[in-house]
């Protein structure tokens, strides 16, 4: 008779193979977890914080332009509706404010009154489809001195920053073959609600940037992003010194930003996380200071006695900069630094930079300057420095 293995022996072989297979799977999972852990630890996580309309989302767009593949033609075309909405919101807001300002503003040309009626009566409809006459009325109104005077008083009501930019470009945007350029994409205003993550790589270093809505009712979501953050990039609109919040017309926007920065700086969960401070919208700040219509001292009396520091720190003073503009931007910088130096615990630091988020070269230079700072923060985070 032939020899046959016993049932017990066969079962033992099967169990042995199962055990080996399970071990191989376990080892593979362990290796993958180790790789994931290494990748996680090698990734710089940047949290963009700041009050609403400070320019955070524009910074994210710049990262896409500089470090990803920018925006495809199809993505650009998808922004056309948002850009048209920016034009509609701008002309609706400006013409609507003419009668509510104190003192009110009258149209220069009486024949433009039907145009205003059209804008207010029809363009305000949610299903408005932007017929050719809308652009014609908008272009003619934008030439009216009364409308322009109302625009110049935009700190007295709520108007998007990109209003002038897009109203100046109506003749281009109304073209059926129009495709937005990068500057159009950068300036297009869309309210950020929720948390948006952008991933990119610079010199083989991985970055994850989280953009969170800055309006008051969005800030409760911030706590979800605080875990394992390498650094916070706090963005403030320096040009907002003469403006009030959309959600609270009694609160100055720049003071709100200072209060928000203080609450983040002193947050007990963030006491070891340094902040890179983007003092944004320097172009708009310079325009306002040079125009002289809204003096910084009228909103911040401390500015009257402020002297520009001899040591200008990390910013480059251009030879053609207006001395009053220089004094204004350093005053705002020092208001934030006064908060960051008050604690003096040495556990985290504030690194200020003057920025113009719609200027790609400026953001490229500033972010390159920040990379070494971010790397040091990352090494310190994992106790490698």
From Swiss-Prot:
Signal peptide: none annotated. Residues 42-385 form the G-alpha domain. GO terms for molecular function: G protein-coupled receptor binding; G-protein beta/gamma-subunit complex binding; GTP binding; GTPase activity; metal ion binding. The keyword Magnesium applies. GO terms for cellular component: basement membrane; cytoplasm; heterotrimeric G-protein complex; neuromuscular junction; plasma membrane; postsynapse; presynapse. Preferentially expressed in the nervous system and in the eyes. Residues 207-216 are annotated as: G3 motif. Residues 1-14 have a biased composition (Polar residues). Mg(2+) binds at residues 57, 192. A lipid is attached at residue 3 (S-palmitoyl cysteine). Keywords: GTP-binding, Lipoprotein, Magnesium, Metal-binding, Nucleotide-binding, Palmitate, Transducer. Residues 276-283 are annotated as: G4 motif. Guanine nucleotide-binding proteins (G proteins) are involved as modulators or transducers in various transmembrane signaling systems. The G(s) protein is involved in hormonal regulation of adenylate cyclase: it activates the cyclase. This is G protein alpha s subunit.
